Regions:
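Alpha-helical bundle regulatory/interaction domains
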Residues: 1-20, 24-27, 33-179
Length: 179
């Protein structure tokens, strides 16, 4: 029951964030919109920011749950950027309310997991070679997250598919061919 209530609150908050900035949404707005009491909200979350964090954690679980292979890495990466595009208002609103660092943490987690699964599934490494692979994962994590944050900052001027196509061209010529 608690998970159902949390999902209703999350869905309602996303809907409200289509129309208002997070800073202008009150607990009262949220609870009235989804028909639950303020106490029900506070039984599940400390505040609206706690709910936002829960939403990202839940959505991250869904994205991270995918198995990444050499054959489907483009689809896995696309799902991260498609999530951002599909949740545009929520993501932009979060970006404006929490700042770049919050989304950077979320994206770093997703992209690092994605790259680690991709690379370590394809190769077996030890010692110095493992350190180089870990460095490469960090390097590409920061590159992809930087591109993603820039895309968000510019209010997503291209589609997720167009962005992925550009990323694929770069990655196919470098990280994938190196391992």
């Amino acid at each position: 029951m608690t998970t159902v209530i949390k999902k209703v609150l999350a869905s309602t908050l996303k809907e409200l964030m289509e129309e208002k900035s997070l800073s202008k949404i009150t607990i009262n707005d949220l609870t009235q919109s989804c028909g639950v009491s303020r106490q029900t909200f506070y039984n599940n979350f400390r505040d609206i920011y706690d709910l936002v964090e829960w939403i990202y954690l839940q959505d991250t679980e869904i994205l991270v749950g995918k198995d990444v292979t050499y054959d489907n890495w483009q689809d896995a990466l696309a799902s991260i950027f498609q999530y951002i595009a599909d949740n545009r208002s929520f993501v932009l609103n979060t970006y404006r309310s929490f700042g770049k660092e919050y989304l950077e943490k979320f994206l770093n987690q997703e992209v690092e997991h994605f790259l680690t699964n991709l690379i370590f599934q394809e190769i077996q490494v030890t010692g110095e070679e493992a350190q180089q692979v870990e460095f490469s994962i960090s390097f590409y994590t920061y590159a992809l997250v930087g591109i993603g944050l820039d895309w968000i900052e510019k209010q997503m001027p291209s589609t997720a598919d167009e962005l992925i196509e550009k990323i694929e061209r770069v990655m196919l010529g470098s990280i994938i061919s190196n391992f």
